[in-house]
Amino acid sequence: MPSRRAIVPRPLPGIEAWVTRRILLAGLLLALSLPAPQATTAQSAAAARPLPRLRVSDNHRFLVTEKDDPFFWLGDTAWEIFHRLDREGAERYLQNRAKLGFTVVQAVALAEFDGLHTPNAYGATPLHSDDPTQPNEAYFTHVDWIVRRANALGLYVGFLPTWGDKWNIKRGAGPEIFNANNAEQYGAWLGRRYKDDGVIWILGGDRPVETDAQRGILAAMARGLKAGDGGAHLITLHPSGGQGSASWVHDEPWLDFNMRQNGHGAEFTGRYDQLAVDYARTPIKPVLDGEPIYEDHPIAFDAAKFGHSVAADVRRALYWDLFSGAFGHTYGHHSVWQFWDATRTPVNNPLLPWTGAIDQPGAQQMHHGRTLLESRPFLTRVPADDVIVADRVPTSVPGAGRYRFVATRDTDRTYAMVYAPVGRPFAVHMAAVAGREVRASWFNPRTGAATAIGTFPSDADRTFTPPEAGELLDWILVLDDAAKGYRMPGQGR
């Protein structure tokens, strides 16, 4: 495009020229004194650069961007955001999650809480006549805004086309509205609509796959999504509690990575130990926990017996999953997923309104796991519980129940990390790190602070005692090959 030249008025004779110059100067000074116009939220969202496309890494263990940069999935369950929040509320929530270092928010188009018949904040329901082939433009215009605003803030949307009660009404409001034909049409419509946005498709919605017909519905919806977006976005499946997508659809070509719902118990055994089972499956696919125990949730759905979870419970789930091979992690808060406030019927006893819950300690501590792992080689990380020396009483170390120790390292053995969920002494095989000398540090998962311990030879096992004892005082031991010169844990590369 040719450059534009400023239009300069010709000088006028006498007083007219003087007046004109004064007017022009005054206008210039006024323009310089005014603040630059601020784009509206909608304009900012529309003008934002697209988020990088994501793909599965070459070793099939992680997600990377189109430039092969590692992508750390730090998700949050915002299941009802499209259905319950207006734009002001959504803006408050999204700003908070972006500030806290989250990278994904998980949200449902056809929502759980009577999502077909109870309208959104602007009075719109998602479908005409409960027909997936007749989406309501007014409803999805609001979905558009939230998706694009999230993207503008650097957040991908883990987009569930529907909650599971619309294809398997094992429980919930339903009704069941999907068959293979309309599921494919609905998927294609969504794919076309969001093909250029930063979304990750999540099928399922907290229900098991129990029949061939249900399996066919999911496959048809995935086929429609891929046809609509041209295969631009990854696809996974959110399973029912205590299960993983791998149990039903691991071999399906449309499934790019596995998702587990380890759920709302606080024990390692029987839930969190199952991530390693999915990690070991072939063909190899990345895996993460898309719904672990929520903060402030009734533990095992039985608050009278076990009480409500606290930040320590959600931290344990984070490191149990990551160190067992997950490529990322999803956090959740019991008030936030349902966006509960005093105007709504509470589901399973939330403790405080969502506007306060978004700043609970667990939410603020999740990003420490991200910064820790991003400060070391990322795409070569593997589970490595064999770093830990079993105690004479193995239920102490590596432990059991809420107090299970787990470890990870990279394949080149330049570093190793051990998560200690309780402040008790434990021993490690120093030879797990390849260097002759090993630099040891403590990383505090509650604050993100790192403290040097010292440098030690790698030719013998060594016992380490966490800086503080106590069952809610968890620690991470970081062992580095001293020759690599890595920065302190959590301080970047």
Question: Where in this protein do the model-derived segments appear?
Answer:
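Bacterial N-terminal signal peptides
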Residues: 22-35
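Active-site mouth of glycoside hydrolases
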Residues: 49-51, 55-269
